[in-house]
Amino acid sequence: MLGVIVACMQDMSSYMFGQWDTPLMVLIFFMVIDYLGDIVNAAVEKSLDFKKSYMGIAKIVSVLVVIIVSVLMDRLVNKGTWFFRTFTCYFYVANEGINILENCSKLGLPMPEKLMKTLEDLKNR
């Protein structure tokens, strides 16, 4: 019975998010790192606030909803290619990457300019 439930959940997530490829995996990884970075920065600044933490989770859920919308658009318009979903993933990867670098910078870590520029270029495409 548990196997059937797990299989149904896998099928449902595959339908909602499309193929589990590199852009989607990088986006999810970046969102987790950004969320954890926000928590670390808030702890260092002694301004840890559960309301802000919940807003971070709401932001992640909202991004995932946008990904689902882009997958459904691809299913409707592109019939098997992930154009909208990949574009959306790249956009949010750039946003999350910039946020991660900003979080590290707040902790006093120097940032490679080329990496920041590449993320900004990706965001503006």
From Swiss-Prot:
InterPro entries per the UniProt record, alphabetical: Phage_holin_4_1
Organism: Clostridium acetobutylicum (strain ATCC 824 / DSM 792 / JCM 1419 / IAM 19013 / LMG 5710 / NBRC 13948 / NRRL B-527 / VKM B-1787 / 2291 / W)
Transmembrane segments: 22-44, 54-73
Pfam families linked: Phage_holin_4_1
Keyword Cell membrane: yes
Annotated disulfide bonds: none
Keyword Protease listed: no
Protein name from the UniProt record: Uncharacterized protein CA_C1842
Main location: membrane
Keywords from the UniProt entry: Cell membrane, Membrane, Transmembrane, Transmembrane helix
Family statement drawn from the similarity comment of this UniProt entry: Belongs to the bacteriophage holin family. Cp-1 holin subfamily.
Intracellular or extracellular location(s): Cell membrane
One Gene Ontology cellular component annotation held by this UniProt entry: plasma membrane
Membrane topology: Multi-pass membrane protein
Lineage, opening ranks: Bacteria, Bacillati, Bacillota, Clostridia, Eubacteriales
